[in-house]
Amino acid sequence: MQVILLERVAKLGQMGEVVDVKPGYARNYLLPQGKALNASEANIAQFEAQKAQLEARNLETRKEAEAMAEKLDGQQFIVIRSASDAGALYGSVTTRDAAEAATADGFSLDRKQVSLSRPIKELGLHTVHVTLHPEVTADIVLNVARSAEEAELQASGKSIQELAAEAEAEAEFEIAELFDDIGSAASEDSDLVETPEDRATEEAEDEQP
C-alpha cells in the first residue's frame, strides 16, 4: 500500500515522500495518527497545495520539542515500587508509569512517546528513550526504588546490591553489640554473687585477732 508521509517517520521516510507500507501498518498507525495519507492522486495534489503550511507547522512543533528536550534530557524521575530484598519488582514499570512520573514533575509526556525495549522489573536507575518529535529525542532516567530514601541513595550512585550489603552489615553490627551488652550484664551479675571462695576468705578474715 502506498502512502504519502505528512511528517518524518523513523526508518520509513521524510515528509512528502511516497512510500510502500503494509496495509495493517498504514490503517492501524500511520493514517489514524495523522502521519500519512493514502497516496491517491487527490491526496498528493492536496499535500502539494498545503506543503508550505505543513512544513511551517512541522518547524514550529520541532522548535517546541527542542526546547522541551533541553529541559527534559537527563532528568531523573522517582518511581516507588514494592520489591524483594534481591531487588526484583513485584510487577513491572511500563511506558505509562514513565510518562506519569515525568508528567507529575511538570513535563507533559504521553506513553506513546516513551520507548522501552522491555518492561522494567528490578530496582535501580534505568535510562529510557523519549521521542518528542519525529526529529527530536531525549533520554530520561527512572529511579525505581522502594522508598524516597532508597531512591536518594541510588541517585548518589549506590546500587541495590551495595545498599543490601550495607543493611546486612549494619544488622550484624547491631547483633554483635547486643551480645556484647548481654555478656557485660552477665559479668556484672556474677560479681554480685558470693562464691564459696568468697565466704572462706571472709571467715578467715573474721577469725584473725
From Swiss-Prot:
Annotated InterPro entries: Ribosomal_bL9, Ribosomal_bL9/RNase_H1_N, Ribosomal_bL9_bac/chp, Ribosomal_bL9_C, Ribosomal_bL9_C_sf, Ribosomal_bL9_N, Ribosomal_bL9_N_sf
Disulfide bridges in this chain: none
GO cellular component: ribonucleoprotein complex; ribosome
UniProt key word rRNA-binding: yes
Matches recorded under Gene3D superfamilies: Ribosomal protein L9, C-terminal domain (3.10.430.100), Ribosomal protein L9, N-terminal domain (3.40.5.10)
Keywords tagged on the record: Ribonucleoprotein, Ribosomal protein, RNA-binding, rRNA-binding
Keyword rRNA-binding part of the UniProt annotation: yes
Region (Disordered): 184-209
GO MF term set: rRNA binding; structural constituent of ribosome
Highest taxon of the lineage: Bacteria
NCBIfam families for the chain: L9
HAMAP family: Ribosomal_bL9 (MF_00503)
Function as written in the Swiss-Prot or TrEMBL entry: Binds to the 23S rRNA.
Family recorded in the similarity comment: Belongs to the bacterial ribosomal protein bL9 family.
Protein name (record): Large ribosomal subunit protein bL9
Organism: Dinoroseobacter shibae (strain DSM 16493 / NCIMB 14021 / DFL 12)
Lineage, highest ranks first: Bacteria, Pseudomonadati, Pseudomonadota, Alphaproteobacteria, Rhodobacterales
